[in-house]
Amino acid sequence: MDGYPARGAPRASVRVSTTTTTSFPSRRRRCVRAGRPTVFAREASSRDAEDAEDAACDVVVFVNAKSGGRRGKEVLRRLRRALKPPHRVLDATKLAAAIDRGDPEATTWDARSTRALVAGGDGTVGHVTDALRRVRTPPPIAIAPLGTGNDLARVLGWNDDVWNDERLFDERRLVSTLRRADVGGVDRWKLEARRRGRAETTTRVFTNYLGIGVDARAALAFDTVRKDARFSWLFAHAATNKLLYAVFGARDFLQHSFARLDEDVVVAVDDRVVEFPRDTEGIILLNINSFSGGVRMWSSADRGARGDATFSKSRADDGALEIVAVTGALHLGQLNARVAKPVQVAQGRRVRVELKRDLPVQIDGEPWLQRAGTLDVSFLDSLAVLRRPRRDRLNDLLDKWFQFASSDGGDEDGGAKTSLSRFRRAALVACFVVAAAFAAWKTWFA
C-alpha cells in the first residue's frame, strides 16, 4: 500500500502519507465544504462582535478621591493610567467646578452609548448625579464601592469583590463589565424641611433611606469626628470605620437619648397618622432594602400588628417608601449582626414628619441636626442605574467556590510563612482598631 512500510522494513523507513487528515476532524471538514461556521469560527465571531460592542461603548468614571481613606486617591491615579480616550476619568470632588467652567469632559456625552462608573460611597452617587443634572440627564451609573455602607451598590449587585484590581484597572474588562450590565431605575425622593415658625424651605434629595433618631445620632457623631483634621488618620480602613460607628452608637446605648421617640415625632403616611411601638428610638424610611452595610430591613422585618397581607415587597423603583422602627443602639447592633429584626410600620408614597424637638436626621449617610418643624417627603424622579446581571453574579459565585475548592496551603514551609504573615497583619489591624476605638471614645465622651 502506497505510503505504508513493507513488512519487516526498518523503523526509519516509516513514512506518513501527505493526505492523512486525522488532525482535521471530518465534521469540521464537512462544515468548511458546506460554508457553515465551525464552533471555533462561531466563538471567534462572537468575540469579534463583543469587541465591536465594547468599542462603541464610551465610559466615564467619577472617582471620589476622599473615599476609602487612601484608596480613593490610588484608584483615581491608576484609572487615569489604565483608561485611554474616548474613555474619561474625573475627580468627583472637582466635578461641580469643572461643570461651572464648561469643561467638555464633564459636560458632553452621548446618552445612547455612554455608561458611567462612580467610585465612592452612596453619598458620592448623589453628589455626582445632582451635578450632572445641571447639564443634562446622566448616563446609566454603576458603582465601585469605596464608602462605609455601600448599600445602593449592594442592591445593584456591585459588591466589594466585583471590582477587584484585575477588573477595575483593565480597560477591556472594565468596559465589557459595564456594557453587559442591565439598565434599570432607582427612585429619587425629595425632602423639604421647614423650621417651626419660618416660611423658608430647605430641599434635599435621597435615594437610599432617611433616618431619624438613634441611627442618625451615630452617623452625626461619626461625621463630626471624620471632618476633624486631628483624627483623619482614624478613617483609613473600612474595619476602623465600622468600629467607630459602633463606638458612637454605644453612647445612646448607655444614655437612651431617644427614649419615647414616638412622643417627639408624628408621622403621617399618605395622609394617615401611623403609630410606633412605645420603645421606638429610631425611625427609618427605606427606598432600598439594604441599610447600614447590607441589613435587609424590610424583607426580614417583624410584621407587627398589621399582618402579612397589608404590605407588598420592597422595590427600589416602585414609587413607594417603607417605614420601619428600631428600639435603640443595641437593636441596631443586633441588626448588623443579623440576630434581630426591625418592626414594619407602614408603606406609602407620601410621608410627612412633624418633629416636636430638635433631632438628628440623616439621608444616605449624610447627617445633620434638624430643628423642630416638619419634613415632607415625596417622589422626585428616577435615576438610571446599571445592575450586575444575575448570570454574572452566578459566575462570580462559582469562580469564588472553585478558587476556594482548588486552593491549598502549599508546602509546609510556605504554609507556615503564610500563616505567620496573616498573623502579623491581623495583629497590626487589631492594634490599629483598638487605638482608633480608644481615641474616638476619649474624644466623644470627654
Describe the predicted segments one by one.
Residues 15, 424-446:
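Terminal signal-anchor or tail-anchor transmembrane helices
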Residues 60-77, 82-104, 109-112, 117, ...:
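Catalytic core of DAGKc-family lipid kinases
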